Each structure stands twice: as structure tokens, then as C-alpha cells.
């Protein structure tokens, strides 16, 4: 889905714009996170390749946000070695080397900014208020039937994670129970012994779900 590729860019606007107020709609100088990102790009020389441009975006966003966004961009795949041909409004080459990734990581770390104190990768339009207030999770009850989970009366959950015995995520689901108090989601893979389910708050705190 081409629109899924836009999600990380919108999440940055949701958090830095809607949660932190860094948007032209709220700043008296009509600046903001994205306006400042665009201005930086406008006033600096273009990089030669798409891979360089993609990875430089990680540095620029961290610089403008005054936050270490390496974890966020790593989870979205920006800092993954790749060498492919992309057909999107025309055909082009996308190459990201490990050396370039290491360079960007070093430059971002050298900025000295703290990491966000939220699970930025899980913010959605529906959870903006959770990220503003950062309430703790209120546990409800949960049942499982095969690979389908039903969560009842859980509150302040940004997302649910299903992880395997190594801690690798095998399923992630939206945590909000709107408009009812019950949410149901189904994994694409079969449930296995050793799998665990966690409710994740806006701050990234995890609460184990028991059945």
C-alpha cells in the first residue's frame, strides 16, 4: 500500500506538530517542525543520490526536532542497507550502504540530543491526546481464540504487541477501544507456545497481557 509509506512522515507531524505544538497553526512566527525541515533542505545543497537523501533526512529531522530519532527511523527501515530499483513515478536506483548508515548514526549521536520519551512509532490521529497526557495503562481482561485476541476495558493503550520467545514482534495492533470498550485483532501467523502479548503506553511502557 503506497499510503503506508507516508505513515512515518505523518507521525512526525502528529507528534512534533499536534502534540508539541511545533506547527504554523500554533507558532506565532508561523514556523514549526516541518517548515524548519523544508527550510533546511531549501538552503542546503542537494545530495547526489536517493540513498544519500533518504538517510540525510534522518539527520535533518533529528537536528530540527532537537531529538535523537535514530530508533524511530530504524524501525521504519530508513537505516537498513538496500540496493534496489524503485518504480514510483519513474524508475530510479536506491542504494543505502552500511558505511552511510554508520556515518548518519555518528552524526546524529554527535548532536547530543535525547531520545523522545514516547513510543513515536505508534502514534496515530486517534491517539494524539494519549501522547499529550501520557497516562498509564489501565489493565482490563483479555481472551484468545486461536490467533484472535479480544481485549476488554483496557485503557490508555497506544498499541498491542505480540512477540515470540526471542522478543521479535510478530504482530502489532492499534490499542484504542473506540467507540466500544472491546477491541479484537487477529495475527496472520498461528499462535505458538512462548508467544507473549503486551499493551504499550504512549511512553513505551509495556504491560503484560494475561489470558
Residues of each region from the PLM?
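Active-site-proximal alpha-helical
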Residues: 1-85, 97
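Beta/coil-rich, acidic/histidine-enriched accessory regions frequently appended to metallopeptidases
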Residues: 49-210
Amino acid at each position: 500500500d503506497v499510503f503506508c509509506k507516508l505513515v512515518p512522515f505523518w507521525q512526525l507531524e502528529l507528534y512534533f506538530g499536534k502534540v508539541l505544538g511545533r506547527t504554523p497553526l500554533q507558532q506565532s512566527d508561523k514556523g514549526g517542525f516541518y517548515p524548519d525541515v523544508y527550510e533546511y533542505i531549501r538552503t542546503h545543497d542537494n545530495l547526489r543520490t536517493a540513498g544519500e537523501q533518504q538517510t540525510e533526512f534522518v539527520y535533518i529531522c533529528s537536528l530540527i526536532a532537537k531529538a535523537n530519532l535514530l530508533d524511530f527511523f530504524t524501525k521504519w527501515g530508513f537505516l537498513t542497507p538496500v540496493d534496489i530499483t524503485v518504480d514510483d513515478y519513474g524508475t530510479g536506483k536506491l542504494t543505502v550502504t552500511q558505511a552511510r548508515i554508520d556515518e548518519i548514526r555518528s552524526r546524529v549521536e554527535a548532536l547530543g540530543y535525547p531520545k523522545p520519551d514516547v513510543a513515536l512509532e505508534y502514534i496515530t490521529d486517534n491517539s494524539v491526546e494519549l501522547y499529550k497526557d501520557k497516562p498509564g495503562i489501565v489493565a482490563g481482561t483479555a481472551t484468545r481464540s486461536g490467533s484472535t485476541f479480544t481485549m476488554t476495558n483496557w485503557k490508555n493503550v497506544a498499541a498491542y504487541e505480540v512477540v515470540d520467545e526471542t522478543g521479535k514482534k510478530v504482530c502489532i495492533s492499534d490499542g484504542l477501544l473506540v467507540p466500544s470498550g472491546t477491541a479484537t485483532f487477529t495475527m496472520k501467523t498461528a499462535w505458538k507456545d512462548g508467544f507473549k502479548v503486551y499493551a504499550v503506553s504512549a511512553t513505551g511502557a509495556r504491560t503484560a497481557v494475561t489470558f
